[in-house]
Amino acid sequence: MTNIRKSHPLLKIINNSLIDLPTPPNISSLWNFGSLLGACLTIQIITGLFLAMHYTADTTTAFSSVAHICRDVNYGWTIRYLHANGASMFFLCLFIHVGRGLYYGSFTLLETWNVGIILLFSVMATAFMGYVLPWGQMSFWGATVITNLLSAIPYVGTDLVEWIWGGFSVSKATLTRFFALHFILPFIISALVMIHLLFLHETGSNNPLGMPSNSDKIPFHPYYTTKDFLGLLLLTLLLMTMALFYPDLLGDPDNYTPANPLNTPPHIKPEWYFLFAYAILRSIPNKLGGVMALILSILILMVIPFLQPNKQQTMMFRPLSQFLFWILVADLLTLTWIGGQPVEEPFINIGQMASMLYFSLMVFIMPTTCLIENKMLKW
């Protein structure tokens, strides 16, 4: 008799995705981050749901409702800090996941890669709207500054901004719609995750060698379920340590001051995971140019499959590309640091150089190096 997990219509899908899935035998811990992102999304949806039960999306009571959650709701402070730091863990896993895709050439799986970039944009939009909800100073001014960037779009910009605001400034209408969108987007993200996995399972996973492993695959369970569980354990440990011992380590003190439209904070800056893009935005003196650079800093990932003419899929045996990859990582860390600094010398200069290096590496230096390495293969 056939096992029920192989014959039942619903269990069969789960079985083919999580149990009997043929997996390369040599994938490293860097392949754990996909499942960790799934865990992060689950944590965010559950904690977010409990927060939404007590939160009120109204400019007069939003800040107080967050204080009420932290003071009066049973373990409300834990849920709030798990949600806030869970977002940081989410982005940490996301950046490593994308970095692994770049290093090991996973961008050759075009459909999976492109859905992944759409997912990255969706998660960034969700996180931005979530940051506005506590209605502190940085929430209000962050929302004002970032939404106001759309006014740089020629002809329709101003109308578009007022349409998003629901008025002539960031107000109750803005907060209400941001809450509604922040609530619905994680479920849209969940659907996109299913599509991401559907495309991935069409082709199968890549591996560190970049070699076809069809003749040598092993079942996902028990090998990789055990391996993923260890990753989940470490992620939980890190998240709980952050939420319970250092809950405000990555937050902004300004957000403990209620939003005041008449008082601008000295340094408006987003959360740490947006700082690299914010630094690129600020490094261009023109408003429209800055907005375009900001969008292109992420959108450039979509053209990477067409910019990499490499004969070997992964960087495993390409030392020049490896060196450039780590320069790119250092450059992104520099941009993250610059994004949190005030707009003055020498930070302006460093930011401009780091932004130029970022785009040069992606568009010109790395593809040229690939061509050189292709030539070296013939020597």
From Swiss-Prot:
Where, by residue number, does the polypeptide cross the bilayer? 33-53, 77-98, 113-133, 178-198, 226-246, 288-308, 320-340, 347-367
Keyword Iron in the entry? The reply is yes
Q: Could you tell me where this protein is found in the cell?
A: Mitochondrion inner membrane
List residues binding a ubiquinone: H201
Q: What is its main location?
A: mitochondrion
Q: Which domain of life is it from?
A: Eukaryota
* GO cellular component labels: mitochondrial inner membrane; respiratory chain complex III
Q: So which cofactors does this thing need?
A: heme b
Cysteine pairings via disulfide bonds: none
Question: What residues does heme b b566 bind to?
Answer: H97, H196
What does the entry list as the binding residues for heme b b562?
A: H83, H182
Cofactor: binding details:
Binds 2 heme b groups non-covalently.
* Keywords of this entry: Electron transport, Heme, Iron, Membrane, Metal-binding, Mitochondrion, Mitochondrion inner membrane, Respiratory chain, Transmembrane, Transmembrane helix, Transport, Ubiquinone
User: Biological process (GO) annotations?
Assistant: mitochondrial electron transport, ubiquinol to cytochrome c
Q: Which PROSITE patterns does this chain map to? A: CYTB_CTER (PS51003), CYTB_NTER (PS51002)
Molecular-function GO terms, alphabetical: metal ion binding; ubiquinol-cytochrome-c reductase activity
Similarity section = Belongs to the cytochrome b family.
Something else known: Heme 1 (or BL or b562) is low-potential and absorbs at about 562 nm, and heme 2 (or BH or b566) is high-potential and absorbs at about 566 nm.
Q: How does it assemble?
A: The cytochrome bc1 complex contains 11 subunits: 3 respiratory subunits (MT-CYB, CYC1 and UQCRFS1), 2 core proteins (UQCRC1 and UQCRC2) and 6 low-molecular weight proteins (UQCRH/QCR6, UQCRB/QCR7, UQCRQ/QCR8, UQCR10/QCR9, UQCR11/QCR10 and a cleavage product of UQCRFS1). This cytochrome bc1 complex then forms a dimer.
Q: Describe its function.
A: Component of the ubiquinol-cytochrome c reductase complex (complex III or cytochrome b-c1 complex) that is part of the mitochondrial respiratory chain. The b-c1 complex mediates electron transfer from ubiquinol to cytochrome c. Contributes to the generation of a proton gradient across the mitochondrial membrane that is then used for ATP synthesis.
The name this protein carries in UniProt is Cytochrome b
Organism the protein comes from: Lepilemur dorsalis (Grey-backed sportive lemur)
